[in-house]
């Protein structure tokens, strides 16, 4: 059990009766890493989830205490031989867990606790916590880990997407108001996107140069994806780049050349549409089947960078690569 605290096997007074917990012959060891500050996580839900999963798994649970803590916990869990680590939080918690488990035999699973839960949805995990917990319980009888790729930017792994420019500036603004992010979810992201564009990208935004193989593109925003979609607006997938899947062994990207007040509404409509394609817009170029991408400032101004919806700071250069089959997952 190491330094992790064994969850107490007691039924909460309001535990839902529809969690069916039967005892298998041998329980797998599970570490649940909980982000107590995630948008939809509470002490009550934490205890209910732990109680339910104890029926099929030998459960330890630990809360994260600071940025990067989940990465440390996952490295230790892999070293101690846990059969699975469950990240209970948002995409930032999942990202840290993936960075800690990369290259190890210990698989990662997710329980939705954030505002978007993009990677969990990409893996096919139900968006509702009760359904996701029952899904995880059912997997105890059908345990089939599989390997997925990880993208890398400046040494930091990401599970689904990363970006520089407008995309990252929106993430920076949203992260600065966590209470509104938790309360308003995708609607706060939409407001932040419009207001950030008007304040920082309508006039003279920072320019960047994107180099992928023999192609060099100039733009004001670049996104790089390890899979599709780029994100979700509630349950609606937002498609930007094309061609990447979690096990394709390659990345996909898109470059926005100019962010004009005429072009941006049409690009936004294409992103939300189930039929139109963002890459068909004349201000957007796509990058497909790429293994390495370098994005650098073209005018000396630093570029905001995000990975999996977490703001990583401003950089002069971002180097992207792919780690094929680097992460074990169960879903």
Where is each model-derived feature located?
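Short N-terminal binding/cap micro-motifs at the start of the first secondary-structure element
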Residues: 39-43, 231, 327-329
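Short Gly/Thr/Asp-enriched flexible loops that form oxyanion-binding sites at enzyme active sites
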Residues: 93-106
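ATP/nucleoside-binding phosphotransfer catalytic cores, i.e., glycine-rich phosphate-binding loops
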Residues: 2-7, 16-19, 212-214, 240-248, ...
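Glycine-rich beta-strand-to-loop/alpha-helix junction loops that act as flexible
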Residues: 36, 88-90, 111-114
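ATP/NTP phosphate-donor binding region
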Residues: 1-85, 95, 134
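Catalytic core of DAGKc-family lipid kinases
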Residues: 33, 43, 64, 103-107, ...
């Amino acid at each position: 059990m190491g330094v992790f605290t064994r969850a107490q096997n007691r039924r909460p007074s309001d535990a839902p009766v529809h969690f069916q917990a039967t005892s298998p012959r041998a329980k797998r060891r599970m570490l649940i890493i909980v982000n107590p500050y995630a948008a939809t996580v509470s002490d009550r839900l934490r205890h209910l989830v732990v109680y339910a999963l104890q029926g099929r798994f030998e459960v330890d649970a630990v809360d994260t205490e600071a940025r990067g803590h989940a990465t440390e916990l996952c490295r230790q869990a892999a070293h101690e031989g846990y059969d699975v680590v469950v990240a209970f939080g948002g995409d930032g918690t999942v990202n840290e867990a993936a960075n800690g488990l990369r290259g190890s035999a210990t698989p990662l699973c997710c329980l939705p606790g954030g505002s978007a839960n993009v990677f969990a949805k990409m893996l096919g995990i139900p968006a509702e916590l009760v359904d996701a917990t029952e899904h995880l319980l059912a997997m105890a009888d059908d345990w089939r880990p599989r390997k997925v790729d990880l993208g890398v930017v400046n040494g930091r792994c990401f599970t689904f997407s990363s970006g520089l420019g407008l995309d990252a500036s929106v993430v920076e603004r949203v992260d600065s108001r966590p209470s509104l992010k938790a309360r308003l979810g995708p609607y706060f992201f939409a407001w932040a996107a419009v207001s950030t564009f008007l304040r920082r990208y309508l006039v003279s935004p920072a320019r960047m140069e994107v180099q992928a193989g023999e192609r060099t593109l100039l733009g004001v925003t670049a996104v790089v994806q390890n899979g599709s979609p780029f994100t979700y607006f509630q349950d609606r997938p937002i498609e930007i780049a094309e061609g990447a899947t979690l096990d394709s062994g390659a990345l996909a990207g898109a470059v926005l050349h100019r962010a004009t007040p005429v072009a941006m509404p049409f690009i936004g409509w294409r992103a939300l549409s189930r039929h139109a394609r963002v890459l068909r817009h004349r201000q957007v170029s796509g990058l497909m089947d790429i293994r390495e991408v370098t994005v650098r400032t073209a005018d000396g101004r630093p570029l905001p960078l995000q990975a999996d919806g977490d703001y990583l700071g401003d950089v002069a250069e971002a180097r992207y690569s792919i780690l094929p089959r680097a992460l074990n997952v169960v879903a």
